Swiss-Prot record:
The modification N6-(pyridoxal phosphate)lysine is found at K286. One of its GO terms (cellular component) is cytoplasm. The record marks F21 as: Participates in the substrate recognition with KAPA and in a stacking interaction with the adenine ring of SAM. This is Adenosylmethionine-8-amino-7-oxononanoate aminotransferase. Pathway: Cofactor biosynthesis; biotin biosynthesis; 7,8-diaminononanoate from 8-amino-7-oxononanoate (SAM route): step 1/1. It is found in: Cytoplasm. The keyword Cytoplasm applies. Pyridoxal 5'-phosphate binds at G118, A119, D257.
Amino acid sequence: MWELDPKTLEKWDKEYFWHPFTQMKVYREEENLIFERGEGVYLWDIYGRKYIDAISSLWCNVHGHNHPKLNNAVMKQLCKVAHTTTLGSSNVPAILLAKKLVEISPEGLNKVFYSEDGAEAVEIAIKMAYHYWKNKGVKGKNVFITLSEAYHGDTVGAVSVGGIELFHGTYKDLLFKTIKLPSPYLYCKEKYGELCPECTADLLKQLEDILKSREDIVAVIMEAGIQAAAGMLPFPPGFLKGVRELTKKYDTLMIVDEVATGFGRTGTMFYCEQEGVSPDFMCLGKGITGGYLPLAATLTTDEVFNAFLGEFGEAKHFYHGHTYTGNNLACSVALANLEVFEEERTLEKLQPKIKLLKERLQEFWELKHVGDVRQLGFMAGIELVKDKEKGEPFPYGERTGFKVAYKCREKGVFLRPLGDVMVLMMPLVIEEDEMNYVIDTLKWAIKELEKEV
């Protein structure tokens, strides 16, 4: 089936397929990768060329491609039933997964609402938080507090609480109102020169000043420990915990977006664990199925859930749902994903790799066109600059990050930058020699810039 020559596939790809976050005029002018199969941390394109998947297929692959246990989970469920609705009915894998997610999540997050991707998980949290206050009879709450440089997905609600001008500015007239605190990393670096307790205290005071002076705040929403899509911008120590303490003090809800950070990316199952934070909502996606199928989840508390209980005629229930909510196949592979974490001791084996990554990242500071190096757990960003001394960036239109990524492709490493930030988000199961090859290749590709600039 589908035995087509590569040239035909390339032609049809450019003729019919509109790709996400892609300037299609440029895409049509270039040679692009069309992947056909994967095994472990490797991908093969339609010409049989092999690449290390150094971005985990956009940060979602956990245990590698074509994992036998995950494959089997999908096939076993497929032989039973692929999908049944969860609107007023249920299915076995969705029930089992909900129980398991509650068991591994911060204490108090006892209810699970499914969706298909991280933006939807955030959208659901936004609507639930707003609806919660309505059901409680509290009037006038219609404002969210978020962060500059935030990214929570691309649906209108998620964009409203976002803060990346390049991605979100076009849609500003469509969006609901928010209050934005400064990006913690950028604020700390500009004012204090580093991430430090003094900066944490400064940011928390700004938040407290808002919370104690307003009664219209629905919730505070932020990513967990790092603003990943903004270029891997980590939070100062204790910031997330401090925010949680303030939301409790001022009776405000807290939404934590663990879509990018969840399922081991920061070294623990969820970043919230590292600061002892249990929010009112936790949004999950990406790695929840090990990178196999679209699935996301919004976890919340009994307090929130109970506010939606009532007689049918009261119409308190949550009017939200998708066709594939709690899909049987996706929930089955998500369960297998969590079993692999336990059986293969994934998080335990990850710790020396995080240490190796930290050590190897120091080498990038020596490079002429590297202006900053950032890391949280197994997530890293290397920022490229035209002039290190002046902090001058490359012009956006030069696509310098993509040029470096294309160089890496020549040596069999698949990367996708965030602007001019080279992102390393490797599958958790990558071996240390494979890590070293990725890092060596990226260093070489950045050095090649010196010949062009």
